[in-house]
Amino acid sequence: MNYKDTLNLPKTDFPMKAKLPSREPEFLQEWESNNLYQRVQQKRSGKPKYILHDGPPYANGNIHMGHALNKVLKDIVVKFKTMQGYDSPYVPGWDTHGLPIEHQITKTEKVDRKSMSDVEFRKKCHDYAMKYVEIQKEEFKRLGVRGDWDNPYLTLSPEFEAEQVKLFGEMAQKGYIYKGLKPVYWCTDCETALAEAEVEYHDKRSPSIYVGFHVKDSKGEFNEEGVEFIIWTTTPWTIPANMAIALHPEFQYSLIKSGEKHYIVATDLLETVAEEAKLGEYQIIREYTGRELEGIVCQHPLFDSRESLVILGDHVTLEQGTGCVHTAPGHGHEDYEVAQKYDLEVLSPLNDSGVFTEEAGQFQGLYYDKANKEITQALDKRGALLSLSFITHQYPCCWRCKESVIFRATEQWFASVDGFRQDALKAIEDVDWIPAWGEERIKAMVMNRGDWCISRQRVWGVPLPIFYCQECGHELITEESISAVAELFRQEGSDAWFEKEAPEILPQGIQCSCGAKKFSKETDIMDVWFDSGSTHRGVCAQRQELAWPVDLYLEGSDQYRGWFQSSLLTAVATKGESPYRECLTNGWVVDGEGKKMSKSQGNVIAPQDITNQYGADILRLWVASSEFKQDVRVSQKILKQTAEAYRKIRNTARFILGNLYDFTPEKDYVSFDQLEEIDSYILCRLQKVIDQATRAYDEFEFHEFYHLIHNFCVVELSQFYLDVIKDRIYTMPTESRERRAAQTTMYYLLDSLVKMLAPVLTFTSEEIWQYLPGDREESIQLTDWPEVNEELVDNELEQKWANFLEFRKEVAKALENARKDKKIGSSLESKILIYADEDLFKKLQSFEDNLEELFIVSQVELKKAEQLTETVKNQALSSEDVEQASIIIEAAQGEKCPRCWNYHPEVTKAEELCPRCSHVLETSNK
């Protein structure tokens, strides 16, 4: 007889192979056609809000692994909070203005900017941005990210631009906006100012020169002839703009004699300077403090008509150089700041393209970087060059064109951070920063930053809503003018600024304080960081489903100097507080060896490659498994490991589903007090897992959740509980309490597990959900997070089983050793004799009726340690001495039952059933 037909073997249509790359798009289509996002929001309507505000990615190019990591993290947070019962909408957004898009249009798409009007060029930029909004939108959706994709926010939308203008106006009305001549980062290739966050650093080879500035008037400090202050610089091109030499007031400076010349150098740097500047032998004549040398006048080394004043500054250090700092107020922030105290001219003899103007004298017409050679030669010719060498160092470069950038003083519009710096620092303290070091990082940045240069000399952006009186040149930024511009942008978009003249924009009758009524428009646009820094106002404060302030900002760690800061500054300036309560950062995605990904290195992995090869759920599981607050590694090896972990979780779910094929919860559910003890134990463990998982999600420790759930599925379920109950669920009568109890337990386990997995394995959890028996919500995304059932928590029971499982490990080792020694094949071929000490004997006695099932062997005898004899040991197949017991393995008595495969003394011949199986078949219909 074929006894297989009498067993309750698992059966399910749930596929063993996930086939995620082909299956996941079907789910996406299903969710979209069912309006799942709207249904989730409807269900949570009226509940407490939890708002994660999406930092806008830039609408340029396909998404990369950094985007994928960040977007999936956000999706995990939002889905978890929604399942917890919060109204947690997710409104994705895009940053759509700025230089990178202009650069793509002119450089990549070969558009001749000069052949078209501003409006025509802006139309091309608009279309380019919208093209990539759509491309990135589909790529984000493919990752399983749930959001209001039909209604994202865009910084180019008229409504957003209007709110941005109003925010600017409020800052202006509070006196925070001004125009000034200051050095700012300037890209000569893109011909515009840059924000600090738009600057990258790359290696560059630069000249390193030591130059002598001849003393013209020592103010009576020394009588020696031919005294020179030595400066060091790696930017010879800035020397034409030199106005001063800065010393530290407290440092010691030495007047030395070398040959026929005398030099002034910081005492602590003498040896280094003497060697590098090739001064040769020298003797110290006397020493001064920097303060004593203030006011000395030097001759400019290039121009006879110019002088260089010795001034004092606390920014001077002894880390490198000479302690005498070449100061060009038009080409350095610290130079500018210290020069203001001495009322020095801010000279910047370069045009927008980086070419020297007539103010540079003989160097007029030279590109600044090419002028290094000419200037060095001129210094040498005039006897001012002491030495020339070359160094490779980190140098600021434009984030878009990758060309070197310079500090250049130009007239720009600024936001005066000094006006609200202390309020910003206080607001930082009110935010919960994760990791905690983020607070000190952004504090230091805000404390030490200069004023914010908010103007850009481009056209693709939100225009600065400023007018100029044509009579007196005075700026017009009034509440009335701002309202007019904001309303115009709301109705027609910011293109209207470029299409209309000032009289068509301004209200009739508006006039300057001088009485004039004719105005012209500002031609600069706003910094794109002002765009994205306004999203809390233009999006969160405007959209009904959102709120202000929001609960969470979650972006890469580079945003401390970017979006976190620009958002904080605009919010504090206008509302006096931070726009976010909590700020969480993720690290960079690097390759398997921890190296930065780059096309030249050939180590780039794209999200599209992962979804096509493995599926989005594998990428999502990789995200969850990562300690994302640090840099996160990804490689084919890591992805294969993640796919293997996924397979084990999926197989656990499939095994359970296979054994619920005839289980209807409403009809077959066994009450908790009727469960077997092992069932109660595993459900107790489940409650602990739910508690720990909830805490891990709440604290954004997703990698802890990953390890917790993976360990529970693989070790506690697959390797223990589900393995142990196979005999019960396969061989016991279909309707028996014992079998239904196991099914009830498995059902409860999987129902809770799949809910905990839902924020991470968004596709697979939905697939499992559709196969789970019983009445349930149409989508798992409409369900609630599992809560701890205190009725199932039993700490004494948990400890009892924990102790047993420790001993079970020893039994498993003994069986494995016997298997390795070829003493047994299957563990069911074994009989185990346990000779235990008094304490262990008592503990095992309470399990005595189930030890065969728990050890998955055919027979077990529990004896006291003193009953063990050498004869027993010698006759055994194998024996192991462990703490508190000796484990003896013998061949099982009797023959194998053809139905349950257990050996039984009463089975003496082939095809003979054991007593249990005989009883089952006699009392069942099988």
From Swiss-Prot:
Please name the PROSITE patterns in this protein's record: AA_TRNA_LIGASE_I (PS00178)
Q: What positions does the entry give for Zn(2+) binding?
A: 897, 900, 914, 917
Its transmembrane ranges are none
GO biological process terms on file: isoleucyl-tRNA aminoacylation
Q: Tell where it localizes.
A: Cytoplasm
Instruction: List required co-factors.
Output: Zn(2+)
| Gene3D superfamilies, A to Z | 1.10.730.20, HUPs (3.40.50.620), Ile-tRNA synthetase CP2 domain-like (1.10.10.830), Valyl/Leucyl/Isoleucyl-tRNA synthetase, editing domain (3.90.740.10)
Q: Where is this motif: 'KMSKS' region?
A: 596-600
Which SUPFAM superfamilies does the protein's record reference?
Anticodon-binding domain of a subclass of class I aminoacyl-tRNA synthetases, Nucleotidylyl transferase, ValRS/IleRS/LeuRS editing domain
Where does the motif 'HIGH' region lie?
57-67
How it assembles, according to the record, is:
Monomer.
Could you give the domain comment from the record? IleRS has two distinct active sites: one for aminoacylation and one for editing. The misactivated valine is translocated from the active site to the editing site, which sterically excludes the correctly activated isoleucine. The single editing site contains two valyl binding pockets, one specific for each substrate (Val-AMP or Val-tRNA(Ile)).
Which family, according to the similarity comment? Belongs to the class-I aminoacyl-tRNA synthetase family. IleS type 1 subfamily.
Query: Record's NCBIfam families?
Result: ileS
What's the protein called, per UniProt?
A: Isoleucine--tRNA ligase
